[in-house]
Amino acid sequence: MFGFLNLNKPAGCTSHDCINELRRRLRLKRIGHGGTLDPMATGVLPIALGAATRLLPYLSDRKAYIGTVRFGMSTTTDDITGEICQEQGASHLTLAAIQEQLPQFIGEIEQLPPAYSAIQVAGQRLYARARAGEVVSVPPRIVTVYRIEVLHWQPGRYPELTLHITCGSGTYIRALARDLGTALGVGGTLAALQRIESGGLRIEESHSLESIAPEHLPLCSPQEVLSHLPWLELNAAQLNDWYHGRAVICEGLPPADSCVGVTFATACVGVGISGGDRLHPKVVLKE
């Protein structure tokens, strides 16, 4: 098996749970995913099968989410699965006040990861250390938020705001909910999250975990999933050099140090790095 699956992750399980279930269903050990989703979250989870796992680092880092922020409370996990650590209500909050604060969360921003996250500190996941009662100091990270669009506003004692967010890898929507609530002085936590796009895959073409089986394997090709890369078709002579790890002389390559998808007879044979008139093998896939 070789290729990608556009999996619609269900709520209540981890991304690794999905991998384990697919290994059982497909009787295939070599399976990986292209970006962790929290257990409460649903939506697009790119899955790589077989040697396609070697292409996971080259997925587009652009992701899109629909998230609902609940104001008037804060939680230990920055989402509604955590314990409430502050609760004051926010019935006075208006959409106009929120819209005044949103621009500061667009662009390159500093973001402090949630205490309960998969980031490793001193070889341990943050969530494991938090569950053990440790308070770990983690420096903020620079993340990119390309766009925030308001989809729905529901006033009330604990008003809720639904947003369409487009961002880069490493952005925590939970942290965005927390920080927006802090900026408004009322607290905020993430009430719901769906990833609608990741690695070039969209929710409209996703498949449920229950529907995937060896006899029903809706694979996407590397060319589809890595459509953000330029692609180059090799001839037979170039392919021989490629398979032996030698740089291939090519015309019309993109600027130096660009990633390029490589095919032969329309089949993906890897990824290279451009350098002048030569393409240097980075990932070589052989049949």
From Swiss-Prot:
Broad enzyme group: isomerase
Entry EC number(s): 5.4.99.25
Keywords per UniProt: Isomerase, tRNA processing
GO molecular function annotation: RNA binding; tRNA pseudouridine(55) synthase activity
Active site: D38 (nucleophile)
Similarity annotation: Belongs to the pseudouridine synthase TruB family. Type 1 subfamily.
Protein name: tRNA pseudouridine synthase B
Species of the source: Thermosynechococcus vestitus (strain NIES-2133 / IAM M-273 / BP-1)
